[in-house]
Amino acid sequence: MQSGYLQYVLNKAYRNKIAASGTLELTARCNLSCKMCYIHRAENDAEALAQELPTAFWLDMIRQTREAGTLTMLITGGEPLLRKDFREIYFACKKAGFLVSINTNGTLLRDEDIAFFAQYPPVRVNISLRRFRRNLCRALRDRKNVLTNRREYP
């Protein structure tokens, strides 16, 4: 997003006394277990899954925040792509007219996700690149380096 447009959005929000941005933290679960991260609920954690708010709640929250004049929305977690309803929630944000950004560790992005985002582009996808050195990354995440897993798309 160009800085001039961002400044326009922020100024408009300030003038109208509205929250310029919102955040939807969809889940406390993550498919990684990074030692430096505050998220420590496994992707298959039944208790964490049971505590997640239902799709209808998020759709209503999206409606309410848009009606209140909020302009941008960040979708985050844990790892938001773990939610089976992620696309439904994301699409509701786009349909409502939000400028949408996503925080993800990038390990769950699949071809169909890339195609979906190409059709309904987010403003930004923030992918966690904690470490570039393989040994340090494995020590922190106990998984392969995200750069080892990266794929290029046209």
Named regions from a protein language model:
Residues 1-124:
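Conserved alpha-helical substructure of the radical SAM core
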Residues 1-3, 133, 143:
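Short, structured coil/loop segments at alpha-helix boundaries
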Residues 43-48, 133-140:
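A short acidic, helix-capping loop that chelates divalent metal ions and anchors anionic groups
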Residues 57, 88, 136, 145-148:
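An acidic, carboxylate-rich microenvironment
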Residues 107-109, 132-135:
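Short gly/pro/ser/thr-enriched loop/turn and capping motifs at secondary-structure boundaries
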Residues 127-129:
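Conserved phosphate-donor/acceptor-positioning beta-strand/loop module used by diverse small-molecule
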Residues 140-154:
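Glycine-rich S-adenosyl-L-methionine
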